Design a protein with these regions (language model features):
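Active-site/ligand-binding-proximal alpha/beta "capping" segment
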Residues: 81-127, 134-136, 387, 393-396
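Non-catalytic interaction/clamp surfaces of large macromolecular machines
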Residues: 154-203
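Short, hydrophobic/aliphatic alpha-helical segments
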Residues: 19-26, 106-125, 131, 255-264, ...
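ATP-dependent carboxylate/acyl-activation modules
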Residues: 2-10, 15, 100-103, 183-185, ...
Length: 460
């Protein structure tokens, strides 16, 4: 059964589609109460509106910090329409109940992300908005609450259909509590960072499910992918292919991180989150792909390929002849994309360059490990900061190969040994329980190419 909308409170920061919503409410005979600039926008559009300060008899003060924090507002939001005592109490005080609350919050997360000052950020902490949202969500048996512009189409449908159903109001309330939880978490995290540069004493994160996956690492495991507060591989645009699997995502993330470690055109080929080959080449990603594939062509079959430059036809042609699970790059030439899309088995992702999250999380039984992300340009990573402690003086090409190997070995699971020549891996040993076996594995894969190569290890 739908509950009619007779009276609405509207106070929004984001004015997108405000006039459309106000017009629909007014046409349906809904009385609208509003605040400040929201009321002005509605009135300027010729939509009848009652200013909240006129209704409460209390003016907005302190630059708008206090405008809706008033018993006449919150009583109208919190009154249970099916509770005779509630209705008698507000009737005695000449307070009319609300059927609909439309609120969206000050953009706190966007403000701090823009580099705003501490004082500017403080002013973007919404107080009245969350209070009204939470009140309406608590009282969703009587009040429908709209907390985001993405819900406006649903609102318009409800206006035309005679109101919201109980199930719809419950879902809207659930969205509110998720929204305010994320809002408060952003504030708490920001204040904690402002207080200290150390790892936080308290840490939280809201994750939103992006999609369900067919299964997890194994067929008997359920799985889904969630997006957080930072962008990355989760936000990549899929241009072609079947839906991504759990293992596709883990390999794609590993490959993408591997190529972002390099400034020159780079390609990485991954299998089970380990590189089959990595290469950089000033001539472009086509040559880099060829060199990366030559490192271990057997393992590269069915792998995940990442490039840190636009994929052109010169790279697409050889890649299209080899079974590849996923290809990820910042962009694609039109002819290269057309060729690759003829392969039904390949998943093609377009991903914008993003800053790697400075914090890494790892679940453990009963808790979570948190550490700063292993950034490749940490102190000591640049060749200019190295000390040669033995052997003949190193020439420029050898130093270039060493820097490449050092940047590339970070993407190899420990114990890790990476052999390189001409800024391309020629043999990789990974995941062994002792470093000697990793070295043997790398040398065996390099074969005759091992002569004159350089080596990098992730430990002594």
């Amino acid at each position: 059964m739908r509950k009619p909308i007779r009276r609405a409170l509207v106070s929004v920061y984001d004015k997108n589609r405000l006039i459309e919503i106000g017009t629909a409410l007014s046409a349906a005979g809904v009385e609208i109460l509003s605040t400040g600039s929201t009321a002005k926008n509605l009135a300027d559009a010729g939509i009848p509106v009652v200013e909240v300060s006129q209704y409460t008899g209390f003016p907005e003060i302190m630059g708008g910090r206090v405008k809706t924090l008033h018993p006449r507002i919150h009583s109208g939001i919190l009154a249970d329409h099916d509770n005779s005592e509630h209705m008698a109490a507000i009737a005695h005080l000449e307070i009319a109940p609300f059927d609909l609350v439309i609120i969206n919050l000050y953009p706190f997360a966007e403000t701090i992300a823009s580099g705003a000052s501490f004082e500017e950020s403080i002013e973007q902490i919404d107080i009245g908005g969350p209070a009204m949202l939470r009140g309406a969500a608590k009282n969703h048996g009587s009040v429908a609450v709209i907390s985001h512009t993405s819900q406006y189409d649903q609102l318009l449908e409800a206006i035309n259909s005679g109101g919201f159903t109980e199930a719809e109001r419950r879902q809207l309330a659930l969205h509110v509590f998720r929204t305010t939880a994320q809002y408060d978490l952003a504030i708490a995290t920001w204040l904690g960072q402002a207080e200290s540069n150390e790892l936080p004493e308290w840490f939280g994160q809201i994750w939103q499910r992006k999609s369900l996956l067919r299964y997890g690492e194994n067929p008997h495991q359920g799985a889904a992918i969630y997006s957080g507060s930072t962008s990355g591989i989760v936000d990549a645009q899929q241009l072609h292919g079947k839906e991504m699997s759990f293992n596709n995502y883990t390999d794609a993330d590993a490959a993408w991180r591997a190529v972002l470690d390099h400034r020159d055109p780079a390609v990485a080929i991954m299998k089970h989150a380990n590189p089959c080959g990595v290469a950089v080449c000033e001539q472009g990603v086509a040559v880099a792909y060829q060199h990366a594939h030559e490192c271990d062509p057997v393992s590269a079959f069915g792998g995940v390929v990442a490039a840190n430059r636009k994929v052109d036809m010169a790279m697409a042609e050889p890649l299209s002849k080899i079974f590849t699970e996923v290809l990820i790059a910042p962009d694609f030439d039109a002819d290269a994309l057309e060729l690759l899309m003829k392969k039904p088995s390949i998943r093609i992702l377009k991903c914008a360059f993003t800053m790697i999250n400075p914090i890494e999380l790892r679940p453990v039984s009963g808790g979570m490990l948190l550490q700063g992300t292993d950034l490749i340009d940490a102190h000591g990573d640049l060749p200019s900061q190295w000390n040669q402690v033995s052997g003949e003086p190193v020439d420029q090409q050898t130093m270039k190969d060493l820097e490449f190997a050092w940047r590339s070995v970070r993407s190899v699971k420990s114990n890790a040994i990476l052999l390189a020549k001409s800024t391309a891996s020629i043999g990789i040993g990974m995941g062994q329980v002792n470093r000697v076996d990793s070295a043997r594995l790398a040398v065996s894969r390099a074969g005759d190419r091992v002569k004159g190569c350089v080596a990098a290890s992730d430990a002594f």
